[in-house]
Amino acid sequence: MRREERQQHARETTRRAILDAALELFIADGYTQVSIRNIAAKVEYSPGAIYSYFPSKDEIFFALAEEGFHLLSGPDDPGRREYLRSLEPVDRIREMFWHVYEFSREQPQYFALMFVDRYVPRISREYERFAFVRDMKHELIARIQECIDAGDFPSTLDAPVACRMLIMGVLGVAAMQLSDRLGPPEQADVLARDVLNTLLCGLKSGVSLQSRDTLCAVDEAASRATVS
Protein backbone atom coordinates (compact mmCIF):
# COMPACT_ATOMS: atom_id res chain seq x y z
CA MET A 1 0.00 0.00 0.00
CA ARG A 2 1.40 3.36 -1.00
CA ARG A 3 1.90 6.17 1.48
CA GLU A 4 -1.06 8.16 0.14
CA GLU A 5 -3.30 5.10 0.37
CA ARG A 6 -2.18 4.42 3.95
CA GLN A 7 -2.91 8.00 4.91
CA GLN A 8 -6.34 7.88 3.29
CA HIS A 9 -7.13 4.57 4.99
CA ALA A 10 -6.05 5.97 8.36
CA ARG A 11 -8.20 9.05 7.85
CA GLU A 12 -11.25 6.98 6.89
CA THR A 13 -10.70 4.73 9.92
CA THR A 14 -10.52 7.73 12.23
CA ARG A 15 -13.60 9.31 10.69
CA ARG A 16 -15.50 6.05 11.17
CA ALA A 17 -14.43 5.86 14.80
CA ILE A 18 -15.66 9.42 15.40
CA LEU A 19 -19.05 8.70 13.80
CA ASP A 20 -19.50 5.42 15.69
CA ALA A 21 -18.65 7.08 19.01
CA ALA A 22 -20.94 10.02 18.31
CA LEU A 23 -23.85 7.76 17.36
CA GLU A 24 -23.46 5.79 20.57
CA LEU A 25 -23.33 8.95 22.68
CA PHE A 26 -26.23 10.63 20.89
CA ILE A 27 -28.43 7.60 21.56
CA ALA A 28 -27.29 7.08 25.15
CA ASP A 29 -27.29 10.69 26.35
CA GLY A 30 -29.41 12.62 23.83
CA TYR A 31 -28.13 14.93 21.14
CA THR A 32 -28.24 18.12 23.18
CA GLN A 33 -26.25 16.60 26.04
CA VAL A 34 -23.28 15.55 23.89
CA SER A 35 -20.39 17.86 23.09
CA ILE A 36 -17.41 17.59 20.78
CA ARG A 37 -15.33 17.18 23.94
CA ASN A 38 -17.42 14.15 24.97
CA ILE A 39 -16.92 12.57 21.56
CA ALA A 40 -13.20 13.31 21.65
CA ALA A 41 -12.87 11.68 25.06
CA LYS A 42 -14.66 8.54 23.88
CA VAL A 43 -12.33 8.03 20.91
CA GLU A 44 -9.31 9.29 22.87
CA TYR A 45 -8.55 12.19 20.54
CA SER A 46 -8.25 15.88 21.26
CA PRO A 47 -11.25 18.10 20.44
CA GLY A 48 -9.03 19.83 17.88
CA ALA A 49 -8.52 16.51 16.11
CA ILE A 50 -12.29 16.03 15.89
CA TYR A 51 -12.70 19.49 14.37
CA SER A 52 -10.20 18.58 11.67
CA TYR A 53 -12.75 16.01 10.48
CA PHE A 54 -16.03 17.74 11.30
CA PRO A 55 -16.43 21.50 11.76
CA SER A 56 -19.31 21.10 14.23
CA LYS A 57 -21.43 18.62 16.16
CA ASP A 58 -24.26 19.30 13.72
CA GLU A 59 -22.04 18.21 10.85
CA ILE A 60 -21.45 14.91 12.64
CA PHE A 61 -25.20 14.46 12.91
CA PHE A 62 -25.73 15.25 9.23
CA ALA A 63 -23.07 12.68 8.27
CA LEU A 64 -24.81 10.04 10.41
CA ALA A 65 -28.27 10.97 9.11
CA GLU A 66 -27.01 10.73 5.54
CA GLU A 67 -25.67 7.24 6.27
CA GLY A 68 -28.93 6.28 7.93
CA PHE A 69 -31.15 7.38 5.07
CA HIS A 70 -28.90 5.60 2.58
CA LEU A 71 -29.25 2.45 4.69
CA LEU A 72 -33.02 2.95 4.66
CA SER A 73 -33.12 3.36 0.90
CA GLY A 74 -30.95 0.27 0.53
CA PRO A 75 -28.55 -0.65 -2.26
CA ASP A 76 -29.59 -0.51 -5.89
CA ASP A 77 -30.65 -4.16 -5.99
CA PRO A 78 -32.01 -5.31 -9.39
CA GLY A 79 -33.44 -8.42 -7.75
CA ARG A 80 -35.48 -6.40 -5.27
CA ARG A 81 -36.67 -4.04 -7.99
CA GLU A 82 -37.85 -7.01 -10.04
CA TYR A 83 -39.55 -8.52 -6.99
CA LEU A 84 -41.43 -5.28 -6.28
CA ARG A 85 -42.49 -5.01 -9.91
CA SER A 86 -43.93 -8.54 -9.74
CA LEU A 87 -46.32 -7.59 -6.93
CA GLU A 88 -49.81 -6.21 -7.26
CA PRO A 89 -49.89 -2.43 -6.68
CA VAL A 90 -51.30 -2.57 -3.14
CA ASP A 91 -48.96 -5.41 -2.16
CA ARG A 92 -46.07 -3.36 -3.54
CA ILE A 93 -47.00 -0.49 -1.25
CA ARG A 94 -47.35 -2.86 1.68
CA GLU A 95 -43.86 -4.24 1.05
CA MET A 96 -42.28 -0.79 0.69
CA PHE A 97 -43.73 0.53 3.95
CA TRP A 98 -42.94 -2.71 5.74
CA HIS A 99 -39.33 -2.15 4.72
CA VAL A 100 -39.39 1.10 6.71
CA TYR A 101 -40.48 -0.82 9.81
CA GLU A 102 -37.82 -3.47 9.22
CA PHE A 103 -35.21 -0.72 9.09
CA SER A 104 -36.14 0.23 12.66
CA ARG A 105 -35.43 -3.33 13.76
CA GLU A 106 -32.22 -3.77 11.79
CA GLN A 107 -30.73 -0.31 12.48
CA PRO A 108 -32.27 0.82 15.79
CA GLN A 109 -29.58 3.40 16.57
CA TYR A 110 -29.87 5.12 13.21
CA PHE A 111 -33.66 4.95 13.43
CA ALA A 112 -33.68 6.56 16.87
CA LEU A 113 -31.40 9.36 15.72
CA MET A 114 -33.36 9.99 12.50
CA PHE A 115 -36.94 9.68 13.75
CA VAL A 116 -37.12 9.74 17.57
CA ASP A 117 -34.77 12.41 18.98
CA ARG A 118 -36.69 15.65 18.46
CA TYR A 119 -33.71 17.87 19.26
CA VAL A 120 -31.45 16.91 16.37
CA PRO A 121 -30.94 19.47 13.57
CA ARG A 122 -33.50 19.51 10.76
CA ILE A 123 -32.17 17.97 7.57
CA SER A 124 -33.86 20.77 5.66
CA ARG A 125 -30.81 22.85 6.55
CA GLU A 126 -28.91 20.64 4.11
CA TYR A 127 -31.70 20.14 1.59
CA GLU A 128 -29.40 19.59 -1.40
CA ARG A 129 -27.42 16.97 0.48
CA PHE A 130 -30.64 15.19 1.41
CA ALA A 131 -32.41 15.55 -1.94
CA PHE A 132 -32.36 11.76 -2.23
CA VAL A 133 -34.62 11.58 0.84
CA ARG A 134 -37.17 13.71 -1.00
CA ASP A 135 -36.86 11.33 -3.94
CA MET A 136 -37.58 8.38 -1.63
CA LYS A 137 -40.77 10.04 -0.43
CA HIS A 138 -41.85 10.89 -3.96
CA GLU A 139 -41.30 7.26 -5.00
CA LEU A 140 -43.69 6.11 -2.27
CA ILE A 141 -46.25 8.70 -3.33
CA ALA A 142 -45.93 7.60 -6.97
CA ARG A 143 -46.64 3.99 -6.02
CA ILE A 144 -49.74 5.07 -4.11
CA GLN A 145 -50.87 7.11 -7.11
CA GLU A 146 -50.53 3.94 -9.21
CA CYS A 147 -53.07 2.28 -6.93
CA ILE A 148 -55.41 5.24 -7.33
CA ASP A 149 -55.06 5.14 -11.11
CA ALA A 150 -55.64 1.37 -11.12
CA GLY A 151 -58.83 1.75 -9.09
CA ASP A 152 -57.46 -0.02 -6.00
CA PHE A 153 -57.87 3.20 -4.03
CA PRO A 154 -60.68 5.73 -4.60
CA SER A 155 -59.99 8.53 -7.05
CA THR A 156 -60.66 11.08 -4.30
CA LEU A 157 -57.68 9.88 -2.26
CA ASP A 158 -54.81 12.34 -1.94
CA ALA A 159 -51.64 10.26 -2.47
CA PRO A 160 -49.34 12.47 -0.33
CA VAL A 161 -51.83 12.35 2.56
CA ALA A 162 -52.06 8.55 2.27
CA CYS A 163 -48.27 8.33 2.26
CA ARG A 164 -48.08 10.42 5.42
CA MET A 165 -50.64 8.24 7.20
CA LEU A 166 -48.89 5.00 6.27
CA ILE A 167 -45.45 6.22 7.26
CA MET A 168 -46.74 7.57 10.58
CA GLY A 169 -48.41 4.25 11.28
CA VAL A 170 -45.29 2.14 10.87
CA LEU A 171 -43.01 4.74 12.50
CA GLY A 172 -45.32 4.95 15.49
CA VAL A 173 -45.15 1.22 16.21
CA ALA A 174 -41.40 1.24 15.57
CA ALA A 175 -40.85 4.10 18.04
CA MET A 176 -42.97 2.39 20.70
CA GLN A 177 -41.07 -0.86 20.24
CA LEU A 178 -37.73 0.91 20.40
CA SER A 179 -38.65 2.63 23.67
CA ASP A 180 -39.77 -0.69 25.22
CA ARG A 181 -43.40 0.44 25.49
CA LEU A 182 -44.65 -2.79 23.91
CA GLY A 183 -44.33 -6.48 24.63
CA PRO A 184 -41.74 -8.83 23.12
CA PRO A 185 -40.46 -8.01 19.59
CA GLU A 186 -42.71 -10.64 18.04
CA GLN A 187 -45.77 -8.74 19.31
CA ALA A 188 -44.39 -5.49 17.91
CA ASP A 189 -44.00 -7.12 14.51
CA VAL A 190 -47.57 -8.38 14.59
CA LEU A 191 -48.86 -4.98 15.68
CA ALA A 192 -46.91 -3.21 12.93
CA ARG A 193 -48.31 -5.61 10.34
CA ASP A 194 -51.85 -5.12 11.67
CA VAL A 195 -51.50 -1.33 11.63
CA LEU A 196 -50.21 -1.37 8.06
CA ASN A 197 -52.92 -3.74 6.84
CA THR A 198 -55.66 -1.79 8.64
CA LEU A 199 -54.51 1.49 7.12
CA LEU A 200 -54.43 -0.04 3.65
CA CYS A 201 -57.91 -1.51 4.09
CA GLY A 202 -59.19 1.85 5.30
CA LEU A 203 -57.74 3.60 2.27
CA LYS A 204 -59.27 1.01 -0.06
CA SER A 205 -62.68 1.42 1.59
CA GLY A 206 -62.79 5.10 0.73
CA VAL A 207 -62.93 6.31 4.33
CA SER A 208 -63.22 10.09 4.47
CA LEU A 209 -59.93 11.75 5.39
CA GLN A 210 -59.72 15.18 6.99
CA SER A 211 -55.94 15.49 6.70
CA ARG A 212 -54.41 17.70 4.06
CA ASP A 213 -51.06 17.47 2.33
CA THR A 214 -48.18 19.40 3.88
CA LEU A 215 -44.63 19.82 2.67
CA CYS A 216 -42.01 17.83 4.53
CA ALA A 217 -38.97 19.74 5.79
CA VAL A 218 -36.78 18.86 2.81
CA ASP A 219 -39.57 19.66 0.32
CA GLU A 220 -40.22 22.97 2.04
CA ALA A 221 -36.57 23.98 1.92
CA ALA A 222 -36.28 22.97 -1.72
CA SER A 223 -39.40 24.99 -2.54
CA ARG A 224 -37.97 28.08 -0.88
CA ALA A 225 -34.70 27.65 -2.75
CA THR A 226 -36.53 27.37 -6.07
CA VAL A 227 -38.49 30.55 -5.42
CA SER A 228 -35.39 32.48 -4.41
Where are the regions a protein language model picked out?
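Hydrophobic alpha-helical connector segments
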Residues: 78-109, 159, 163-166, 189
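Helix-turn-helix
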Residues: 13, 17, 21, 25-59, ...
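Helical hydrophobic small-molecule/effector-binding pocket
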Residues: 74, 94-116, 134, 138, ...
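N-terminal intrinsically disordered/low-complexity leader segments
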Residues: 1-13, 207-228
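Conserved hydrophobic residue
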Residues: 31-32, 153-154, 182-183
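Amphipathic alpha-helical segments used for helix-helix packing
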Residues: 105-124, 175-179, 215
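Hydrophobic alpha-helical segments that form the core
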Residues: 101, 157-178, 187-199, 217-221
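Amphipathic alpha-helical packing segments from all-alpha helical-bundle domains
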Residues: 70, 76-77, 124-150, 160-164, ...
